[in-house]
Amino acid sequence: MGKRLLDKLWERHVVATNENGLDLLYIDLHLVHEVTSPQAFEGLRLTNRTVRRPDLTFATMDHNIPTKDVWNITDRIAKQQLDTLRENCKQFQVPLADIGDEEQGIVHVIGPELGLTQPGKTIVCGDSHTATHGAFGALAFGIGTSEVEHVLATQTLWQRKPKAMGIELKGKLQKGVYAKDIILHLLSKYGVAVGTGYVMEFYGETIQAMEMEERMTLCNMAIEGGAKAGIIAPDEKTVAYVKGRKYAPRDYETFEKKWFELYTDADAIYDLHISIDVTDLAPYVTWGTNPSMGVRIDEKLPEKHDVNDERAFSYMGLSPGQSTYDIPVQHVFIGSCTNSRLSDLEIAAAVVKGRKVKEGVRALVVPGSKRVRDAAMQKGLHHIFEEAGFEWREPGCSMCLGMNPDQVPEGEHCASTSNRNFEGRQGKGARTHLVSPAMAAAAALYGHFVDTRKESYDGAISYS
């Protein structure tokens, strides 16, 4: 019987197996940020240990950074976490993309763009959305603070091998429908626990047609379905994306041969298989308080089925049977590790070019990294957004989570390109609706959600 992509990735990294069936995995890349690392570094200090492989560790500042005035950090805890990371990286000789550094940005944006993320690697980070890097054929997953310390000290991690889930995507997406809509559809149909105990492998003709940044969006939200990770087999697009980046390997012939061996064999069998035809897929909007509470833009909000629905409707200030077009939008956030890359900003800019943000709507565009921001500005995207009435910010996690000054006021609705819509995620009492960059941009213009399939834009920007 053939092997799945998961099998090949796992077997390449097993150092030892214990009597309980746990495998000790070697970790090829450890990404670090300011929120989940302080206790881990302190643990090293207390036990008189060093970081075993500083060269396989890379840190950045992202969660706590203000995106309007990056140096004006008024929150005491946020400032302490940022200062502590700076001190820890200096003491333990860990590379750090500090505030203002050209390599700084959201950890799951800078990994790929710097070439740190590569096919075949095991990648961990003290962050839920580490699965993003699986788009490159890497086995990438989030870990807890105690595990962060273990990896810092040993460059290994004890893990139980998950099962493999195959998710085949067939068909061509309509104009105005994107990878974000695919993952929101998957979650709305199968729920937030469908992937529990599994690694999701996305494959099929739809995946083959996707560019790398769309693939990253899919893998980023695999965790929202309960999966350990999301992975996609590397192909020519993967290699083309990685090639030439700062930390990418120079011996491409050797690496390409190994990378192209990373695929699921034709006779391999998944532990669970799902097939989705995306041909008739519509843009999605979440209405509730977890990412599976979503509907097509052309559907009414569902009936209440249990106490969770009851609570969600109450928190969101919405009602069963309500039209998605009638959901008010007071805030728009285009950013996060899910949708803050250059192509995301280009799509949003195409929607708003020559138009104006609806009066009473506050709209933010927060690039995922310094490099994304610079590239967008070279193409003039900042002018398009600012002329439309958007705020153009510095890179950071921003309004994805309530850990910095960018928050949604209590009781107000936000169209957000982020990945989580839990109660209070964007601030106390904030009401979050997860959507694609196109849907968020369009909502800023109308003050409510509209069907981006019917918008008269071509999805491309002319820079002449």
From Swiss-Prot:
Q: Give the binding site residues for [4Fe-4S] cluster.
A: C337, C397, C400
Write down how the cofactor binds this protein.
Binds 1 [4Fe-4S] cluster per subunit.
Please give the InterPro entries that the UniProt record associates with this protein: 3-IsopropMal_deHydase_lsu, Acnase/IPM_dHydase_lsu_aba_1/3, Acoase/IPM_deHydtase_lsu_aba, Aconitase_4Fe-4S_BS, Aconitase_4Fe-4S_dom, IPM_dehydratase_rel_enz, IPMI_cat
Q: Name one GO molecular function term.
A: 3-isopropylmalate dehydratase activity
Pfam families cross-referenced by the UniProt entry:
Aconitase (PF00330)
- Keywords for the protein's UniProt record, in alphabetical order: 4Fe-4S, Amino-acid biosynthesis, Branched-chain amino acid biosynthesis, Iron, Iron-sulfur, Leucine biosynthesis, Lyase, Metal-binding
Annotated S-S bridges: none
NCBIfam families for the chain: leuC, PRK05478.1, PRK12466.1
Self-association state and partner proteins as the record states: Heterodimer of LeuC and LeuD.
| Name of the protein described by the UniProt record | 3-isopropylmalate dehydratase large subunit
Species source reads: Bacillus cereus (strain AH187)
Lineage of the organism:
Bacteria, Bacillati, Bacillota, Bacilli, Bacillales
